[in-house]
Regions:
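Active-site neighborhood of HAD-like aspartate-dependent phosphohydrolases
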Residues: 1-22
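Helix-loop "lid/cap" segments that line or gate small-molecule binding pockets
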Residues: 5-11, 31-49
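A short, structured active-site edge motif that brings together acidic residues
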Residues: 23-27, 52-56, 113-127
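Metal-dependent phosphoesterase signature
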Residues: 40-81
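Short, acidic loop-to-helix structural element flanking the phosphoryl-transfer center
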Residues: 64-95, 105, 128-131
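Conserved phosphate-coupling serine/threonine residues in phosphotransfer and NTP-handling enzymes
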Residues: 97-99
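Conserved Lys-Pro-Asp/Glu-containing loop-to-beta segment of HAD-superfamily phosphomonoesterases
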Residues: 128-155
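Acidic, Mg2+-coordinating phosphoryl-transfer loop and its flanking beta/alpha structural elements
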Residues: 146-186
Length: 189
């Protein structure tokens, strides 16, 4: 839904829509603002200066369209039970996401999972900085942590902080299914 929303905010022709959607799917964990800048300059070849006002307009347009398009998003099968089991077993659950906190909180409340999450790190902090903060501030041993992600950039992040990675393969375009050095799942059942 997010990839389609990115394509929609640019009113791109079909060929460019596919490029925009593919870019989003491959770079899922990149910040929204950075995706918009990339789409303007690299996919649409926009040569003029892309100022903050234009970027903010696109971000706001994205928010409106995404809110409308995402009302029917469902959880990945079994993830709610999985989160509750982790919590019951005294595991600490953090969310590190390129999405804004209000979106994350919306889904946590919708599926009654807010109380199971210790802390959310959203688009306001770089994912690498967030992971370092989580590991350092809690004296976590890297080998006792696991990161669930759905993009190559999530996998790269885990390599940088030396944390195990589990690919959640809900996105066929992410190219994670071609990698061999980590756990892969399609759902949490």
């Amino acid at each position: 839904i997010k990839g389609i929303t990115f394509a929609d905010i640019f009113n791109a022709e079909q060929k460019l829509k596919k490029k925009i959607i593919n870019y989003h799917l491959i770079n899922g964990s990149q910040k929204r603002v950075d995706k918009i800048k990339y789409i303007f300059s690299k996919i649409l070849n926009y040569k003029s200066n892309i100022n903050e006002k234009i970027i903010n307009e696109k971000v706001n347009e994205f928010k409106k369209i995404y809110k409308k398009n995402s009302k029917d998003i469902n959880l990945i099968d079994g993830v709610d039970y999985f989160i509750k089991c982790l919590f019951k077993n005294k595991s600490k659950i953090y969310i590190v996401s390129a999405a804004p906190k209000y979106e994350i909180n919306y889904y946590l409340r919708k599926y009654r999972l807010s109380s199971f999450v210790k802390k959310i790190y959203d688009s306001k902090i770089d994912k690498l900085d967030a992971m370092k903060k989580i590991l350092t501030n809690n004296n976590f041993q890297n080998e006792k942590c696991i990161y669930f992600g759905d993009s190559i950039s999530d996998w790269d992040l885990c390599n940088k902080v030396k944390v195990d990675f589990c690919a959640v393969l809900t996105n066929k375009k992410s190219k994670l299914n071609k990698k061999k050095s980590f756990i892969k799942i399609y759902d949490f059942l």
